[in-house]
Amino acid sequence: MQSVLVLDFGSQYTQLIARRIRELGIYSEILPYNTTPETIREHAPKAIILSGGPTSVYGESAILPHEGIFSLGLPILGICYGLQAIAKHFGGEVASSAKQEFGRAKMLVSRDGEPESMLFRNIPDSDVWMSHGDKVVNLPDGFRITASSANSEMCALETYGSKGALKVFGLQFHPEVQHTLYGKQLLSNFLIDIAGITPDWSPKHFIDHQIEEIRRTAGDETVICGISGGVDSSVAAVLVSRAIGKNLHCVFVDNGLLRKNEADKVMQFLKHLGLRLTLADASELFLKRLKNVASPEKKRKIIGRTFIQVFEEQLDKEKFLVQGTLYPDVIESVSVKGPSETIKSHHNVGGLPKRMKLKLIEPLRELFKDEVRAVGRELGIAEDILMRHPFPGPGLAVRVLGSVSKERLDILRDADEIFLEELKSSGLYQKVWQAFSVLLPVQSVGVMGDKRTYENVLALRAVESSDGMTADWAQLPHDFLARVSNRIINEVRGINRVAYDISSKPPATIEWE
């Protein structure tokens, strides 16, 4: 299988680059920015992409690629910081820009060069997405300018003439972001036309590869899988089951942090998947350990440790634990020296105890949510399971802000059920990426039945997204929001005020904690 390597310099969009490549039917892998030429040869890619990053190539904290990658004879595309790293390597000059560019910009393609740039073939002047404070101010020898913007004369560069055979390209903007109108076409031009890659990556190919990997990892050992009934754990369980059959033991943990009637619903449809399944009711244990804990990070750590303990109590001879960890989980959990900061530890990653007795199998670790659903369809999983909204591993513990109690959980469950019920009955549930309620650690004064009340404030959250990496708040109809608010205040005891969250990601995250 032909592949592309993305070298990560810490951009928040690195995972999006990988996703856009896969949308073209090409397999992609992400490796650290300082990966050696020897390691790259072992992966045998057909092309290399250098991601963006938050540092300056001329600063003391500059992180630069291994110089040997430019001697491998592979086509290379640098994006934003990647462009600047290329310019520096080949003797160009990068400096701080007097006017920074963040957001949309108009890109003008240079048409007077000979021969025509293969990278910009069939690409008109159009909007692109910028996010930079530095820019190339002196062109490296052997390069030409192929596009410009109002603030970046050298918006795109490429080798030509005697250096043309190197096939090194750079873009100051981000083709992987949806706001760049022809970004996907640019990537296609680079990977298919310039690098000569034949698209051959698909959900079926991924499944076949993972089945081989799982069998090689697990061997004849038995494996335990914590399953929640959500998309990720369900697809992970079925995929592992395809690989090792009855050697997979699934455990559904009722942690007391689930949505209303969730345990019964989950057990019903999981049995239809033909999995060997055990129910472990540990709700009292979780709530006891979470008592008076307000810190979201502490909640996640406690929940991660308790999950593992519960699994270990269900163990017979199992040596491995399956988790439905996805790419967005990893990028929000792992801080690489130099690149992007840790935003929050994820239940499936940073929340696990370091001295865990089980080895991990994470078959979905390199997939985005939409890819997980595509794999699930290939596996024959029912659509009503695949199209469920994402639900956090720590459950409602991170949607009850502040300390968690059974009383506050019940209030949130009742309110959240009304919100989801109204979304489904109004035909809006499948139009949003994720929707949920958050019980705030705030009380407000109200009046009900001529009496003063002092009760909880609830926030409603609904977002639109394609992968969870970025998200816009969903502009739900006002009459719909009014109906939901009215029902919650009148039907749920303990809430007298409802707010709607209109924050996008970034700067906010989708979940509040």
UniProtKB/Swiss-Prot annotation:
Gene3D superfamilies reported for this sequence: 3.30.300.10, 3.40.50.880, HUPs
InterPro entries: Class_I_gatase-like, GATASE, GMP_synth_C, GMP_synth_GATase, GMP_synthase, GMPS_ATP_PPase_dom, NAD/GMP_synthase, Rossmann-like_a/b/a_fold
GO molecular function, one term: GMP synthase activity
UniProt keywords, alphabetically: ATP-binding, Glutamine amidotransferase, GMP biosynthesis, Ligase, Nucleotide-binding, Purine biosynthesis
Pfam families to which the protein is assigned, alphabetical: GATase, GMP_synt_C, NAD_synthase
UniProt: ATP binding residues: 228-234
EC number: 6.3.5.2
Superkingdom per UniProt: Bacteria
Domain GMPS ATP-PPase: 201-388
Glutamine amidotransferase type-1 domain segment(s): 3-200
UniProt-annotated catalytic positions: 80, 174, 176
Pathway noted in the entry: Purine metabolism; GMP biosynthesis; GMP from XMP (L-Gln route): step 1/1
CC per GO annotation: cytosol
Recorded catalytic activity of this chain's protein: XMP + L-glutamine + ATP + H2O = GMP + L-glutamate + AMP + diphosphate + 2 H(+)
Function (record text): Catalyzes the synthesis of GMP from XMP.
Subunit-structure text: Homodimer.
Name the record gives this protein: GMP synthase [glutamine-hydrolyzing]
